[in-house]
Amino acid sequence: MVPVTASTPKPLTTPGDVVHPADSPDAPWWRDAVIYQIYPRSWADADGDGIGDLPGITARLPYLRDLGVDAVWLSPFYVSPMHDAGYDVADYRDIDPRFGTLADADAMIAQAHDLGLKVLVDLVPNHTSSEHAWFQAALAAGPGSPERDRYVFREGRGEHGELPPNNWPSVFGGQGWTRVTEADGSPGQWYLHIFDTTQPDLNWHHPEVRQEFLDILRFWCDRGVDGFRVDVAHGLVKRDGLPDWDGP
């Protein structure tokens, strides 16, 4: 988890946030908090359409408070084509219409705080949806473009680039690379996706990518979010040169 206390342009954690043992009077709240995870799509449906939503969560927060919960952790509620349960994010600054609106999110956060609950949300920084505006721009811009440099695009191996750049597998099975068709119809570069083909990996060596996620964090901090669970934090930075994988 990444705890935050203010949406100011400063580090989102400090050494003081992490050095105190859980039983210290100076320990941050999250060290011994009871955190309840909510998958928005299936947890509580307020409008009767068969899909869980943010108003449904808001209505049931008193129940969680009465259970002794200290914080709720929401799985992704962002705009998404839902190829991977919302972990394929198309817009990090908006709510998927299936779940509600930003106003619904604000109301949920306010109600949680009124009840003494903290709100944590999932952040998915390793990859975006293939429907994200950045990836669509990368496909349109072509090889060598600044737009492609936000992701992990590479030329293929083999005489005609017909083989993937390395042997990395996808967590979901098969190879971790997909070849694109360029604007002129020719077979083109390959992009890395350590998960689904619709989840292209971002290039975390790129300063624009790092800045974008700082801005996303601050966007949600400004709306009152208390912290973040960072998805695939261990996979953000890949080995230099992307060498073949030798196994565990």
Range-by-range predicted roles:
Residues 2-214, 218, 222, 234-248:
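Acidic/aromatic-lined carbohydrate-recognition and catalytic surfaces
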